[in-house]
């Protein structure tokens, strides 16, 4: 991840774009790029989307990468260790969604019995 972050920083800095990359603008960009990813699957069934993703891996990969690049940069400029944040969130989610209550169901944790 460190090498990827260094490449993202270099790409940005070589173009003097750091001035535009604040938390608000990066959050907006994440949302826009996520919408572009979502648009690829618009109006498809789950089965169609799975097939499309397999058949159009490069296109899907590019949109995922766009989201990830902005997300990694947002974590960087806000001083958030992304790997650590993910680990902490997984631990929190494990408590919200215990296996014995959530296995095989898509119910939100507030409605699990």
Regions found by a protein language model. Give the residues of each.
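Flexible "arm" and connector segments at domain edges
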Residues: 1-64, 68-113
């Amino acid at each position: 991840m460190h090498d990827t972050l260094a490449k993202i920083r270099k790409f940005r800095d070589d173009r003097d774009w750091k001035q535009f990359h604040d938390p608000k603008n990066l959050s907006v960009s994440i949302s826009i790029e996520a919408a572009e990813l979502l648009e690829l699957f618009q109006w498809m069934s789950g089965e169609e989307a799975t097939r499309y993703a397999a058949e159009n891996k490069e296109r899907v990969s590019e949109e995922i990468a766009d989201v990830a690049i902005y997300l990694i940069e947002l974590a960087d400029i806000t001083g958030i260790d992304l790997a650590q944040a993910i680990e902490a969130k997984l631990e929190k989610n494990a408590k919200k969604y215990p296996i014995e209550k959530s296995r095989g169901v898509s119910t939100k944790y507030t409605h699990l019995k």
